[in-house]
Swiss-Prot record:
UniProt-recorded name of the protein: tRNA (guanine-N(7)-)-methyltransferase
Region span, Disordered: 1-29, 151-194
Entry keywords, A to Z: Methyltransferase, Nucleus, RNA-binding, S-adenosyl-L-methionine, Transferase, tRNA processing, tRNA-binding
Record field: catalytic activity: guanosine(46) in tRNA + S-adenosyl-L-methionine = N(7)-methylguanosine(46) in tRNA + S-adenosyl-L-homocysteine
Source species: Aspergillus fumigatus (strain ATCC MYA-4609 / CBS 101355 / FGSC A1100 / Af293) (Neosartorya fumigata)
EC number: 2.1.1.33
Feature: compositional bias, Low complexity: 151-186
An example Gene Ontology CC term for this record: tRNA methyltransferase complex
Described purpose of this protein according to its UniProt entry: Catalyzes the formation of N(7)-methylguanine at position 46 (m7G46) in tRNA.
Cited InterPro entries: SAM-dependent_MTases_sf, Trm8_euk, tRNA_(Gua-N-7)_MeTrfase_Trmb
Pathway: tRNA modification; N(7)-methylguanine-tRNA biosynthesis
Length: 358
């Protein structure tokens, strides 16, 4: 009797079978296209951002090849290429999810922002492979459903009415699915019954170390939204330097954000929430308060951050659908809701660059 295969072999076999099933776009049964299961893509919760990972990154934003990530948005004119010789896109990437994890926010934002290109940045290999496979499966599902809908529409006597009915159901069905779908269903979800705006062609994920190479991917004022959802809190004081929110990184985020752009943050750790507010100049720490009282020369240490960002009011956040998706669609957000924990949200708007003094 042969022993059962080891876990690593089972994971590799499952991943290979899933990739083959997704790539076979000519299959007749759309129900065969299933989303990947997380249990075959397990990895440690942390990755050291200071290690020298084997990462590929462009020399500059003008050298980045986005054509393989967004094939539906590639410029049809082959003469339009970037400095690396890759095909250009019809539009630039303008929404970034830093530390995208298993891609819950990407999936939730895709139908909400169908005209915007969204990218997730993740440093862990297995997690990125899961997200990539998940996006490919969702695209294949939408492609099959779109073909089936087109066939049914052609055979119908009133195609315009049928298409209008389908288009009218898209937004409501997708919003209801995002709000009501439980976390376990994301691993076993089968073929959807309605088309999704954008067909998930506007989302992708890349492996990158944001703390080191963020400016290599995005040009000045390129982005309209940046999401940092449930980042690693790094509780130990000696690990605080690895936090994704810092004065140095905030300056890089401000460089890539266009004036009026938004930076979204959410965490379930209250101490980290106050850390975020302090590093965006909204709150003062104990040392800064004492320096401010003593009129020390270092009292304006966060003056630069205050000139670049302002906090968005709670009234505006209640009207922002991206905040709802950030709370409900992410895997960490669902876990916090199951555990009845608190979610601390802070959104900051990029100010207009101050004018040079005359």
């Amino acid at each position: 009797m042969t022993p059962p295969p080891p876990k690593r072999q089972k994971r590799d076999e499952y991943r290979k079978a899933t990739a083959e099933a997704t790539s076979q776009s000519g299959a007749s049964d759309v129900a065969e296209i299933k989303l990947p299961k997380k249990k075959y893509y397990r990895q440690r919760a942390h990755a050291n951002p200071f290690s020298d990972h084997h990462l590929k990154y462009p020399l500059s934003p003008a050298h980045m090849d986005w054509s393989s990530h967004y094939p539906a948005f590639v410029n049809p004119d082959p003469s339009h290429i970037n400095l690396a010789g890759a095909r250009r896109l019809l539009k630039d990437v303008e929404v970034v999810d830093i530390g995208c994890g298993f891609g819950g926010l990407l999936i939730g934002l895709a139908p909400l922002l169908p005209e915007s290109l969204i990218v997730g940045m993740e440093i862990r290999v297995s997690v990125l492979e899961y997200v990539t496979t998940r996006i490919q499966a969702l695209r294949a599902q939408q492609q099959k459903l779109r073909a089936a809908t087109a066939t049914a529409t052609a055979a119908s006597e009133t195609p315009s009415q049928q298409q209008a009915q389908i288009d009218g159901k898209q937004a409501n069905a997708n919003a209801a699915a995002d709000a009501a779908s439980p976390a376990p269903s994301t691993d076993t979800e089968h073929m959807p019954t309605t088309l999704v705006p954008g067909s998930y062609e506007n989302i992708s994920a890349i492996r990158s170390n944001t703390m080191k190479f963020f400016p290599n991917f995005f040009a000045r004022h390129q982005l309209s939204k940046i999401f940092i959802c449930f980042p690693d809190p790094h509780f130990k004081a000696r690990k605080h330097k690895a936090r994704i929110i810092s004065e140095t990184l905030n300056a890089e985020y401000a460089y890539a954000l266009r004036p009026g752009g938004l930076l979204y943050t959410i965490t379930d750790v209250e101490e980290y929430h106050h850390w975020i507010l302090r590093h965006f100049g909204v709150e003062l720490g104990a040392e800064e308060e004492s320096e401010e009282k003593s009129t020390s020369p270092n009292a304006n240490a966060n003056a630069g951050v205050r000139e670049l960002f302002e906090r968005v009011s709670e009234e505006e956040l209640e009207k922002d659908e991206c905040v709802r998706v950030m709370k409900e669609a992410t895997e960490e957000g669902k876990k916090v809701a199951r555990n009845k924990g608190n979610k601390y949200v802070a959104v900051f708007r990029r100010k207009t660059d101050p004018e040079w003094p005359a």
